């Protein structure tokens, strides 16, 4: 069984037929560098106007090449999983480039019917006080380098990493989840209203 697997990996490396390919354009104001290979994984580093970000991508049989202002992601395997990973890698690279060029922003709204919710940032946490009249404040973690800005009933989560911003926004939404009550009646909470 091991011999077959070895030949399979060898054939991936030596095969010249490309079964799936995606090309991602790199803007002029973004510098993208790549290190590694398909076996050890690729470390992509993007530097742009908003800052710099890195991403580690690894899937054997999926190859990444950078050159001439383009990133080429392709596979020499006819398998569905390899073809699917080409699209996944291309999506991650696009998000990496967009993050350092424009950044990402999630817009959330604080909604309450009776008890006014007080929201404030404290260190790497968002403190939610007086939620449905609770005495104990609820907390939501700010992930990584995401920035949280509170403006009245609006909360903005900004950053260059879409996963950090998305997880921070999700943490805020989950922190105000009401359990064991009718959600049609108790609609207080913090809700994502706009995603990037």
UniProtKB/Swiss-Prot annotation:
Q: Superkingdom of the source?
A: Archaea
Keywords (alphabetical) are:
Ribonucleoprotein, Ribosomal protein, RNA-binding, rRNA-binding
Q: What does this protein do?
A: This protein binds to the 23S rRNA, and is important in its secondary structure. It is located near the subunit interface in the base of the L7/L12 stalk, and near the tRNA binding site of the peptidyltransferase center.
- Supply the InterPro entries for this chain: Ribosomal_uL6-like, Ribosomal_uL6-like_a/b-dom_sf, Ribosomal_uL6_a/b-dom, Ribosomal_uL6_arc, Ribosomal_uL6_CS2
Q: What GO terms in the biological process aspect are recorded for it?
A: cytoplasmic translation
Per its record, what are the GO molecular function terms? Answer: rRNA binding; structural constituent of ribosome
Entry annotated with the keyword Zinc: no
| Keyword RNA-binding (UniProt) | yes
Q: Which Pfam families does UniProt cross-reference here?
A: Ribosomal_L6
Q: How does it assemble?
A: Part of the 50S ribosomal subunit.
Q: What is this protein called?
A: Large ribosomal subunit protein uL6
What PANTHER family does the record point to?
A: 60S RIBOSOMAL PROTEIN L9, 60S/50S RIBOSOMAL PROTEIN L6/L9
A single Gene Ontology CC annotation of this entry is: cytosolic large ribosomal subunit
Q: Which family does it belong to?
A: Belongs to the universal ribosomal protein uL6 family.
């Amino acid at each position: 069984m091991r011999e077959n697997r070895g030949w399979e990996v060898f054939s991936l490396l030596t095969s010249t037929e490309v079964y799936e390919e995606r090309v991602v354009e790199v803007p002029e104001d973004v510098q993208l560098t790549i290190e590694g290979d398909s076996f050890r994984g690729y470390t992509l580093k993007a530097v742009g106007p908003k800052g710099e970000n890195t991403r580690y991508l690894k899937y054997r049989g999926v190859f990444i090449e950078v050159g001439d202002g383009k990133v080429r992601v392709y596979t020499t395997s006819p398998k569905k999983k390899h073809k699917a990973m080409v699209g996944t890698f291309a999506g991650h690279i696009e998000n990496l480039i967009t993050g350092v060029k424009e950044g990402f922003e999630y817009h959330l709204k604080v909604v309450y019917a009776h008890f006014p919710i007080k929201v404030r940032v404290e260190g790497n946490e968002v403190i939610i006080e007086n939620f449905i009249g609770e005495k104990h404040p609820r907390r939501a973690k700010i992930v990584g380098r995401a920035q949280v800005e509170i403006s009245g009933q609006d909360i903005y989560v900004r950053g260059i990493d879409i996963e950090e911003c998305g997880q921070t926004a999700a943490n805020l939404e989950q922190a105000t989840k009401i359990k064991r009550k009718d959600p049609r009646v108790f609609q207080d909470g913090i809700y994502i209203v706009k995603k990037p």
